[in-house]
Design a protein with these regions (language model features):
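Polytopic membrane enzymes that build or remodel cell-surface glycoconjugates and lipids
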Residues: 1-199
Length: 199
């Protein structure tokens, strides 16, 4: 951040934001543009004062925990799991998301400013999965399902533009679809095993 001129924006004009989003290309690399854009916005409002960066990191982590809660809750409400888990879906989702949020493994992702990239990828990863589930299980109009599907696609792109480990998202959605939405079928167990092994 200190030595990267691409994030040292003077205002929030389209030209300056474009510089931060694509400026890394001038170094011969194009990587994590959405993360660099967030650093640029941070720099615009607070310069190199670390407080603002830590505040944004903490906020992103909290939002990720919220969407993880929503994802788990929606999962436990699926027809395949509802009979066994719907009664305790809220408490299970809350406990699981809280344990994830306070787990020591996330300390560096929250406290190290540059590790915001990992937190942003996690946030948009959870968002993409949540919107996918909503799109697949929504009982509303076709338009509602399309909106959720578009939100899933946008979140997926933002996750990949935050950090490359989000490239595993399609595999996660595939396994989620065949195991939790369509449901495990004994006659297809070898196909499921092969898919899991591939992931």
């Amino acid at each position: 951040i200190v030595h990267n001129p691409a994030v040292h924006v003077h205002d929030l004009s389209a030209k300056e934001l474009y510089k931060s989003f694509f400026g890394i290309m001038n170094t011969g690399r194009w990587s994590r543009p959405f993360s660099y854009l967030s650093f640029a916005v941070n720099y615009h409002f607070g310069g190199l004062d670390v407080f603002g960066y830590h505040l944004v990191n903490f906020t992103i982590h909290c939002l990720a925990a919220i969407f993880l809660f929503l994802l788990i809750y929606q999962t436990l409400e699926l027809p395949l799991l509802r009979r066994d888990y719907a009664r305790h879906a809220y408490s299970i989702s809350l406990m699981a998301s809280l344990l994830w949020a306070v787990h020591p493994i996330h300390v560096s992702a929250v406290t190290y400013i540059v590790q915001r990239m990992a937190s942003m990828a996690a946030l948009f990863y959870f968002m993409a999965m949540f919107f996918y589930v909503k799109a697949r299980t929504s009982s509303g109009s076709r338009t509602r399902q399309i909106i959720f599907a578009c939100c899933c696609g946008i979140s997926a792109v933002m996750a990949l533009a935050s950090k490359e480990n989000a490239a595993m998202l399609p595999a996660s959605l595939f396994l989620y679809e065949i195991l939790l939405i369509q449901g495990y079928r004994k006659e297809s167990r070898w196909a499921y095993a092969a898919a899991a092994a591939a992931v």
